[in-house]
A protein has these predicted regions:
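Conserved pre-ATP/AMP-binding loop-to-beta segment of ANL
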Residues: 49-50, 61-94, 101, 109-116, ...
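Conserved AMP-binding/adenylation subdomain of ANL enzymes
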Residues: 111-131, 140-181, 196
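ANL superfamily adenylate-forming
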Residues: 15-86, 196-197
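Short Gly/Pro-enriched turn/cap motifs at secondary-structure boundaries
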Residues: 81-84, 261-267
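Conserved helix-loop-beta element of the AMP-binding
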Residues: 14-15, 33-48, 131-133, 157, ...
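Conserved S/T- and glycine-rich ATP-binding loop of Class I adenylate-forming
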Residues: 89, 95-98, 120, 132, ...
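Gly/Ser/Thr-rich phosphate-binding loop
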Residues: 152-154, 180-184, 194-259
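Short beta-strand->loop structural element characteristic of the AMP-binding/adenylate-forming
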Residues: 1-38, 104-106, 155-163, 192, ...
């Protein structure tokens, strides 16, 4: 709760979108009590919109309305897209808060989109019609990076829940059924698969998969071997970036060889 106050208290939001709860590792987690508590500490709020995602019983939260109520009274209108300046604020990211209260980092429309298009199309080989997945929460900058794939005409694939529930192959089943072209994850996840002797290629076809991205920590040479022996012949890219630039410092290069334990290119 304090983490929300430390961040949102600085920007004084007027509208806040929340979910009543979420599912993880086979369990339902209720968020309503926390929402009621921290929204009471944000005096700038004029409206709290709650998505009935986990179908939990409602509690009374000041100035709240369900998303379903909004839809019931909604009449479709033509969307008007406002033209703004290249550096017009797009979204606010936050520093980790390890050296004090998290710092607000404002990213602009033009710079963010151009950088992401460059990284997607040139470094990650994303094309129109591709199906791009990155296992990430909405609070990680990889979420913002993933969403920008829409700008290339790709389909963004989303997964909500544990990557190991009901078993360690759940994400690969998703990748196979939905024909992922790009699969993004963390080095820790790949290491977990390796330690548990998970062999996705023995269970799934993964015929459309062409790129695997790994980030969050260095990808060991043994994990490179694991991917090529147990997933298939793909472009494996160990990438690294940061919230402050909401993009990458180093990532893949599709036109040069992949060498085990090494990052391909610096931007």
């Amino acid at each position: 709760e304090q983490g929300v106050i430390d961040r949102f208290g600085q920007i004084e939001p007027k509208v806040l979108f929340c979910v009543d709860g979420y599912f993880y590792n086979g369990k339902t987690h209720n968020c309503l009590d926390k929402i009621k508590s921290f929204t009471a500490r944000l005096p700038s709020l004029k409206q709290v919109v709650i998505f009935d995602y986990a179908s939990l019983s409602n509690i009374i939260i000041n100035n709240s309305i369900s998303y379903q109520e909004i839809l019931e009274n909604y009449e479709a209108i033509e969307i008007g897209f406002e033209r703004v300046g290249f550096d017009h604020p797009l979204y606010i990211m936050y520093s980790s808060g390890t050296t004090g209260v998290p710092k607000c980092i404002v990213h602009g429309h033009g710079g963010t989109l151009v950088q992401h298009l460059k990284e997607h199309q040139l470094q990650t080989n994303i094309s129109s019609g591709d199906r791009v997945f990155y296992f990430t929460t909405c609070s990680w900058m990889m979420w913002n990076w993933l969403v920008s794939a829409l700008g290339t005409g790709a389909t963004v694939m989303l997964y909500d829940g544990s990557p190991a529930y009901p078993d360690n192959t759940v994400l690969w089943q998703f990748a196979d059924e939905e024909q992922f072209s790009h699969f993004g994850t963390s080095a820790k996840y790949i290491e977990m698969l390796m330690k548990n002797d998970v062999n996705p290629s023995a269970i799934f076809k993964l015929s459309n998969l062409k790129v695997i991205c790994s980030t969050g920590s260095p990808l060991s040479a043994e994990c490179y071997d694991y991917i090529y022996n147990n997933v298939g012949y793909v472009h494996l890219a160990s990438i690294s970036g940061g919230t402050d630039i909401v993009s990458c410092f180093v990532l893949g290069v599709p036109t040069i060889p992949v060498r085990r334990g090494e990052i391909q290119g610096c931007l």
